[in-house]
Amino acid sequence: MPTSEQNEFSHGSVGVVYTQSIRFESLTLEGGETITPLEIAYETYGTLNEKKDNAILVCHALSGDAHAAGFHEGDKRPGWWDYYIGPGKSFDTNRYFIISSNVIGGCKGSSGPLTINGKNGKPFQSTFPFVSIGDMVNAQEKLISHFGIHKLFAVAGGSMGGMQALQWSVAYPDRLKNCIVMASSSEHSAQQIAFNEVGRQAILSDPNWNQGLYTQENRPSKGLALARMMGHITYLSDEMMREKFGRKPPKGNIQSTDFAVGSYLIYQGESFVDRFDANSYIYVTKALDHFSLGTGKELTKVLAKVRCRFLVVAYTSDWLYPPYQSEEIVKSLEVNAVPVSFVELNNPAGRHDSFLLPSEQQDSILRDFLSSTDEGVFL
């Protein structure tokens, strides 16, 4: 039976769902190394039609997983995009077959640093090979082909998920009809790389790091918590932090900080340690930093090969992935006469991960784009 909290969030829910796993023989990475075997954790919602042309792949951000919608048994909270996935929602499961998978290099069921090395019976940890955004997409392509799907109706994602969607459009241009890129970029700027580098250095400087070969009993928890705290600062806008925290003191008897914002960041860091792996954090942030489709003329040249319609969404308050990066993508698409709809949502008190949050305006934008099947239709 759903809990009262589940009922609160479950209007139009896909209900109780289960993460599945599939094993492929191998995946050759862009760097030349091979993952053998390749494991992919995934969830699906809705039904694949006979023509197999109603499938939508949704791609998660840095700390996400395959659980995009519905509830796992005993969960109080639904999947990370539950507001937008389900019967009658933007990604309507009465109409579409939604696929969500955990990226390789992550720590939520797909091949990554926590995978057991068959040669010694221990987790690969820091000996796992480097994984790129392109490798993540190539792994997803194996999953899509497993379902017998030749052409996806859409690929959608925000932040790192948006990078995956972009990579799909250039790596497999004939295999998707629509591409939705939210709060993302064609490559990281020096500032974005700098934020991630600080997080990685926090992990590397933890006394328990041990060259990435730590035990579960002695993980680099302090370093990972600091990395998450740094990340959360970049997710929030200045106005949101002023409205939510200001200079308020922390609630309760907290000795380690004098301000509410400090208490919030400490909580985010400590809770993150319980659900994420430090090696995966390093692998995934490096994949983000090394992803590059270029900018300007270089990006225009790369995007000349795409064959799908685009929806690009940016957020005025997002200073981690500022709107100018989305505008660069749009300009390059327009030069190539690619049908593209661009929306910049102006919510001063918003945040980078606004694409994950419930929003009637955002729901309408996604719904209208997906339902407008004629090429060249603009919002």
UniProtKB/Swiss-Prot annotation:
Q: Which GO terms describe its biological process?
A: homoserine metabolic process; methionine biosynthetic process
Entries under Pfam families matching the protein: Abhydrolase_1
Superkingdom, taxonomy of origin? Bacteria
One Gene Ontology MF term: homoserine O-acetyltransferase activity
Q: Which reaction does it catalyse?
A: L-homoserine + acetyl-CoA = O-acetyl-L-homoserine + CoA
Identify the enzyme class. transferase
Domain (AB hydrolase-1) spans 54-332
Q: Its GO CC terms?
A: cytoplasm
Query: Which residues are substrate-binding?
Result: 228, 353
Q: What is its EC number?
A: 2.3.1.31
Q: Which residues form the active site?
A: 159, 318, 352
Where does the protein principally reside? cytoplasm
- Cellular location(s): Cytoplasm
Q: In which pathway does it act?
A: Amino-acid biosynthesis; L-methionine biosynthesis via de novo pathway; O-acetyl-L-homoserine from L-homoserine: step 1/1
Keywords recorded for this protein, A-Z: Acyltransferase, Amino-acid biosynthesis, Cytoplasm, Methionine biosynthesis, Transferase
Protein's job: Transfers an acetyl group from acetyl-CoA to L-homoserine, forming acetyl-L-homoserine.
Assembly mode? Homodimer.
**PANTHER family assigned:** HOMOSERINE O-ACETYLTRANSFERASE
Please state which protein family the record places this protein in: Belongs to the AB hydrolase superfamily. MetX family.
This chain's protein is named: Homoserine O-acetyltransferase
Query: Which organism was this protein described from?
Result: Leptospira meyeri
Source species taxonomy: Bacteria, Pseudomonadati, Spirochaetota, Spirochaetia, Leptospirales
